[in-house]
Amino acid sequence: MAKSYTGRKRVRKSFGRIPTVAPMPNLIEVQKSSYDHFLQMDTAPEQRGNVGLQEVFKSVFPIKDFSERGTLEFVRYELEQPKYDVEECQQRGMTFAAPLKVTLRLVVWDIDEDTGSRSIRDIKEQDVYMGDMPLMTSNGTFVINGTERVIVSQMHRSPGVFFDHDKGKTHSSGKYLFAARVIPYRGSWLDFEFDAKDLVYVRIDRRRKLPVTTLLYALDGMNTAALRAQRAAEGRGLEQSEIKGMTSEEILSYFYGKVVYTRGPKGWKTPFDAERLKGVKLVSDLIDAKSGEKVADAGSKMTPRLGKKLREAGLTDIVVFPEDMIGQYVAEDIINEQTGEIFTEAGDELTANLVAELEKAGISELPVLAIDHINVGPYMRNTLAIDKNSSREEALIDIYRVMRPGEPPTLETAEALFTGLFFDSERYDLSAVGRVKMNSRLNTPEVADTVRVLRKEDILGVIKVLVELKDGKGEIDDIDHLGNRRVRSVGELMENQYRVGLLRMERAIRERMSSVDIDSVMPHDLINAKPAAAAVREFFGSSQLSQFMDQTNPLSEITHKRRLSALGPGGLTRERAGFEVRDVHPTHYGRICPIETPEGPNIGLINSLATYARVNQYGFIEAPYRKVFDGRVTSDVVYLSAMEEGRYTVAQANSILDADGRFTEDLVSCRRAGDFVMVPPNEINMIDVSPKQLVSVAAALIPFLENDDANRALMGSNMQRQAVPLIRAEAPLVGTGMEQAVARDSGAAITAKRTGVVDQVDATRVVIRATEETQASASGVDIYNLLKFQRSNQNTCITQRPLVKVGDLIQKGDIIADGPSTQLGELALGRNVLVAFMPWNGYNFEDSILISERIVRDDVFTSIHIEEFEVMARDTKLGQEEITRDIPNVGEEALKNLDEAGIVYIGAEVKPGDILVGKVTPKGESPMTPEEKLLRAIFGEKASDVRDTSLRLPPGVSGTIVEVRVFSRRGVEKDERALAIERAEIERLAKDRDDERHILERSFFARLKALIIGKKVVSGPKGIKAGTVLADANMDELHPSTWRNIAIDDDAVMADAEALKRAFDQQVDKLQERFENKVEKLQRGDELPPGVMKMVKVFVAVKRKLQPGDKMAGRHGNKGVISRIVPLEDMPYLEDGQQVDIVLNPLGVPSRMNVGQILETHLGWACAGLGQQIGGMLDKYKRNAATIIDLKSKLKDVYGDAIYEDEIAGLADNEITELAHNLTPGVPIATPVFDGARESDIVAMLTKAGRSSSGQVTLVDGRTGEPFDRKVTVGYIYMLKLHHLVDDKIHARSIGPYSLVTQQPLGGKAQFGGQRFGEMEVWALEAYGAAYTLQEMLTVKSDDVSGRTKVYEAIVRGDDTFEAGIPESFNVLVKELRSLGLNVELTQRNY
């Protein structure tokens, strides 16, 4: 197997037993595919699907004016090239966006006033600029105003229909009140609900409830529906008089079956239906109508068995006694045939009088509703009985009154309102998802997902399911099931936002079309694109889901992009979300990580996508499974949504299989419909793809996750995201095999776009000459510019280092440069350090961490943080501010780091208070004091009229200047520094251009030579005669640039040579054009905010060493704060003299139940031992005491035959030695989650490494030289330094700002605030009786304004007495009491 470039340099020994069947999808696929789907940039306008931006335009256009004389139609849209690339946008504070150009067509109609017929008069087409559309970078982020942002995907309730009950909470009796809710994607909500009297009501948009039959009356009757369909096919509508609503009879026949009572000579009888009588206790004897015999006694229960027996005995009709008929409900209107008089209406209850009257009238057939009050309840019939409306017209007007209370209803307006509510695609949209969900719930699969409004059948179907639930049939829905929650990703959120903007714009267009002369305008005169552009800007700038990217390290970036939030517009709020929504649900398996979620108020509302999960076209999360046939696992992988998965029996990935892929056990533990069951292999349909498919990326990076308590695993996965990139990254010895995928997909490490050979390498760029065949027009050179000391969003340092050497052959996809927190293409968030678990003088009490001085001395956990400071020179009323070195009242010492333009040099060491950029601001003429007047009179010179407003370094920051950027407004002359920066940038661009050109030339000349060598010359440059056959010698005499002029006698070859020349010239021209564009952008002035003439940004790199107060953590949730740095000689040491680096408290393990850290310690100890053995063998090899074969056999011994043959056997000798050198610190291993190293593996590794199998060693106390009483667990743990650094938190105030109202000092480091002396601290001083201390705390040190001044004056005089006055907060209290009408006055009393 061919290994990647970095894979040859370090091989991870994996303990995973389950082979990888399906590749893990790209980790930021969610973001990229969603936005691509929205923009459809790479699709030709004619071939774009009706989704995303295309659908938004299609749904809003065409726009007609009120008189319908003009129509504005949408033709197509196009995205042009962005003005600046990503890097320029970040530097200039711009948005990375492409101009959106929309082609619109204005059609003007002629309308004949007599006939009303329309004919086209004029068509005008035009491109209109509709603002800028932000583009996604290759890493799935957006650059908005120069900062990288991420749009978090939102989980929300899927559109469709949901059935639920109130869990018996509403009514005191505790009976369940069932309800159904139809939620559209856009439009009015429709709720159906039972009340305590078992009547069915409907609410529209949470308004007042109406009997559900009112809604049904308003729907089309059977005949009307058929007629409407027929007319629609003919292209006509219905007349008002032809529309009839549903009748009571239709409503009842839909919800209830019919039982016909027939009257014969012996009385009433009815067909025997065992199904209907199932479970009923017979009130009277059951008598066969044919024979008159009794077949069942009164009081007996009609069981299915008895029913079957009677049916087999030939029972067809049974006698109905008159008393049994009383209380039944009539199914149809019963009419006297002779007189036309209605005896009884559908739904009426039969009484003894009514039965007698019907018998008297000679009615022989009586249809009644099949309601038995056991299997079928009379809810709809009862609702019909209490409904005061009885016709379509009354129902429509009643609905109108509820929706528009206070407005006088007319039939037309009521009809228009009702149709607009649910049946008009402009106002109501179920969406494709909603339709699919509704079809599956109502079991109507024949309806296409393009039918996105409600149909009459849907409404009836929903009510029918609701009534059946009440009758005890079917199940209610679980709203936390992932089949009922879906994900809205970037594309969809953006689509909704853009639609809002376009609808705002539509109103304005309509008004404008009516107010202008439609014949003389062009489309762009009608369009004001501001609302659409503003909607986009608002969404990216201030939406709750558009977040400042967490860029602490590559993992935090990836996790942020894969986050799912239930909050945000149209979602839940923290306060209202209950426990059920936050809980882990069985359907989360393989879709949402059950571990990674924040601690605190957002727990469970913000989740992370599982590693293998993906989002399907409907927004449901899918998980992959392999199919199982007849107990044999196939390699066929399918993705299933939560709804589909419920139909299958799914085995775990770690089920034991034989070589043929069959299950070896008789009963296998499986999941089925949310439960765990044991089933035989032939019943299994699916099996998990991988054991790590159920956790998120961060959780999958924790080795031995299976041995950690879930709470600690949650902390571990959250804290990895806070790890600061260190100066020297080091990949973990004990990893999980996920490290490479994270480094690659996050974009931190640079991957090669094409196969090629490395041509040049330095710290800032890698130049690769492509060797794979490309189109003639494509360049044969790839230049990768590396980032150096760039500031991330969290002020950590982004810097990239090349891994390749000149001449290396690189395959496409190989990692060629490491980024922050990556080493050899693997994620490296922390360092491997030697840890001992033991107490040490109480310094590791309560999770404190004791570290050795070596860690600070060798910069093991040192990180670089980059702070950005900016200053603007504005144009003020009093004149322009100026950036200058000439600052009043400042000595030369303070200016030593500034150049002649007043800007600090790169490389200068600065400390708090140093000037970074000198700036002076004109100040107004202030009235002069007598002293100033005297000085002015004596010396006659005008005092300086500018004040110093220079940018100084704030307290707590000291470091080195790494970059300075100067931005000047267009038309403002650039200063010397700006010109110098510009020149350096142009030189860099020119070098890139020249290098690329040289490589292109070399490649072109090589191809040209290959074409013409060995051919006969017809004509050529000087020195070559016609008729010469070209050989290497002839060509080497000529300068390659003259080879172009050689003509040969083969026309076909000449044609190829000409094509080659043309392609080369085109590439060179393109190169030059690109260079000139960049230079032109550089030399052009910058777009600065209004009133700003010049802006300078200064970047300071701060080196942060580890110190007491910094927070550190392992990957298992074992966090702590550094308590003390101990001199090397005092640290406990091993018997070979090696000191341990960190001492942790053993008591941190048992109660926390994160045993994974102990297993990691043991395995890390074994890895280091094996590394030492390989290092020893390498030393022998270098001293020629061993051969390369010995080294290979050692590697084979360490890795085992399979890995050795697969990954190491094919390496060259120099690659073997490089690999061995990289393995000396320790052999890296992978222990994948839920499929990692067993205890036996760890023991075997320890034994192989020559360590004790207990993992414990004798430690010696560094202070006394005595060994400790018992052996101590020692090993290598991967520790992280977290972004909670004491330097960012420590803060002290001398004098500073005060709050305006209370006059108390402000709080917090950002405000340079004071320390709060709170209520409990006051109690402490009261308890000590420290009255004077307390008094000054509450007065002169806080908010006694006059007292503060007096203290200052006293200190200046050298006096140490002062008097406390009245605190300002007391005055505030007095004022508040006065505002309540209580006059409080202070009276002076002298005792």
Swiss-Prot record:
Provide the Gene Ontology terms for cellular component: DNA-directed RNA polymerase complex
> What is the protein's name according to its record?
DNA-directed RNA polymerase subunit beta
Q: What does this protein do?
A: DNA-dependent RNA polymerase catalyzes the transcription of DNA into RNA using the four ribonucleoside triphosphates as substrates.
Which Pfam family, giving just one, matches this sequence?
RNA_pol_Rpb2_3
Q: Which domain of life is it from?
A: Bacteria
Q: Which family does the entry's similarity section mention?
A: Belongs to the RNA polymerase beta chain family.
Q: Which organism is it from?
A: Paramagnetospirillum magneticum (strain ATCC 700264 / AMB-1) (Magnetospirillum magneticum)
Extract the signal peptide range.
Answer: none
Keyword annotations from UniProtKB, A to Z: DNA-directed RNA polymerase, Nucleotidyltransferase, Transcription, Transferase
Q: What biological process terms from GO does the record include?
A: DNA-templated transcription
What EC numbers are recorded for this enzyme? 2.7.7.6
